Amino acid sequence: MKPSDGLEALQNLLGYRFGDEGLLHRALVHRSYLHENPHLDEKDNETLEFLGDAVLGLAISHFLLEQFPDYNEGELSRLRSAIVNERELTRIAVELNLGEYLLLGKGEEMTGGRRKASLLADSLEALLASIYLDGGLDAVLGVIKKLFDVYLRFEKREHVLKALDKDYKTQLQELTQARYKLTPVYVLDREEGPDHDKTFHMNVVLEGQVLAGGSGKSKKDAQQAAAEKALQIIAADSWSLD
């Protein structure tokens, strides 16, 4: 199947029919394709990806607030991070067979671009942005609710709650890799107390910057405490990558 073929099948899986299929086409154009075809007067999907990230975050936040009105900001942020991450976006992209529709350069194709998690996740965000531009907010909310149904149906809320069982370090790593393409590092700040009753203070560092600190009776507990604080800081938009 050619990448440009089968768009009707993709629209059927999405449960959405484009009024302007040009927007759908643009969502599938990777920059590598245009680099190798400079004569084409087209745009790649990177700006759509930027918009799609914001649209998806808004939609999931909206649905979680509806679903769990009694949850506090920290709990909602943890749920959103458990849902909106590269792993889950890639899973949905694979279910849509999205990789087969992408327009890639030959080099990207040869290195397995159609199966790359980051590329698939980014392309899904671009696809959601194209739906938003084509049909508006209500249209994209409907598609996102369909695609993320396993998390968002009330009777299936245990799937979302199960995500809360993830340790904070795992959640933080997934979030920072998805948002910043970086992996957090944990550094011992200091130890206090006698050998039989030590308290460890750990810092979580991102790109050379201390993001947060935490304490515990073991290094592992201190790392978890630091990761929890880091998640809260990122959720509150109180940190930026300089």
Curated annotation (Swiss-Prot):
Signal peptide: none annotated. Its main location: cytoplasm. Keywords: Cytoplasm, Endonuclease, Hydrolase, Magnesium, Metal-binding, mRNA processing, Nuclease, RNA-binding, rRNA processing, rRNA-binding, tRNA processing. It is found in: Cytoplasm. Belongs to the ribonuclease III family. One of its GO terms (molecular function) is metal ion binding. Gene3D superfamilies: 3.30.160.20, Ribonuclease III domain (1.10.1520.10). GO terms for biological process: mRNA processing; regulation of gene expression; rRNA processing; tRNA processing. Digests double-stranded RNA. Involved in the processing of primary rRNA transcript to yield the immediate precursors to the large and small rRNAs (23S and 16S). Processes some mRNAs, and tRNAs when they are encoded in the rRNA operon. Processes pre-crRNA and tracrRNA of type II CRISPR loci if present in the organism. The keyword Amino-acid biosynthesis does not apply. HAMAP family: RNase_III (MF_00104). It catalyses: Endonucleolytic cleavage to 5'-phosphomonoester. Its EC number is 3.1.26.3. Mg(2+) binds at residues 49, 122, 125. PROSITE patterns: DS_RBD (PS50137), RNASE_3_1 (PS00517), RNASE_3_2 (PS50142). InterPro entries: dsRBD_dom (IPR014720), RNase_III (IPR011907), RNase_III_dom (IPR000999), RNase_III_sf (IPR036389). GO terms for cellular component: cytoplasm. Its cofactor is Mg(2+). Residues 7-136 form the RNase III domain. The keyword Transport does not apply. This is Ribonuclease 3. Homodimer.
